[in-house]
């Protein structure tokens, strides 16, 4: 409804009182809930056990450095220099268990101390975390998506190459292979690779390592199924999957010797697969 003109103005007779005090404000209150979850799951103890005996100590401790990097990623940081923007946030310091955050150079030197051995320990830490969570979810089937991902890098990074990033052709990048649970998005395993590698290269050793991890994590291996793109349509991968007795779905490339176009043109009956998606099944023995 229309307001009276006399009801719109407000009288201001003096200055607003301002009081300055030492008040600890934060922009990342959600870290407290995350921190409680980590304490309940004894995350710090897991980190110390995994990295025991490695040269990753330092003044801050390995658990504090790991939690600081986790906090940096959670709040949206993408570069080590972004740690400086979090130095005065009390909840970030509380989450990391530190009274004072390290400088970006200190974090960089700590990361440079990583070797292939300590990277393997990091894989063990991730496997241990997922191994605790996944059985408790009671999933009847576990769908594992295996695919290559693009990680952009700086200009002076070893084994990073230009031209292989489909969205940023001029940006150097890595091309790691990653496996995650489709139902929950938990990352099971990741392995870094050069930026110019084919997606299916070295996929079989990665799948073997992933399977060893699943044997120790999943109670019903018959309920495991894999999903992969066309780069994994290889004889060695298909034989390996068939030998494990698991379900799988792999995109089939349009190789000329498959002559899939002819089957598509002549197929009369298509069955619905998903909303706005239909298909048909084809069983045929082929030799390339």
Which residues make up each language-model segment?
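Hydrophobic "anchor" residues on beta-strands that sit immediately upstream
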Residues: 143, 225, 247
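Active-site-proximal flexible loops/turns
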Residues: 152-154, 232-236, 258
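Alpha-helical scaffold elements adjacent to nucleotide-binding pockets in ATP/GTP-utilizing enzyme cores
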Residues: 206, 236-240, 263
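A short alpha/beta connector and helix-capping loop motif
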Residues: 157-164, 235-253
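Acidic/histidine-rich, metal-coordinating catalytic segments
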Residues: 147, 221-233
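Dynamic "connector" segments at or just before major functional cores
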Residues: 1-198, 203-219, 244
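An anionic, glycine-rich sequence signature occurring as long contiguous blocks
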Residues: 2-16, 20, 247-288
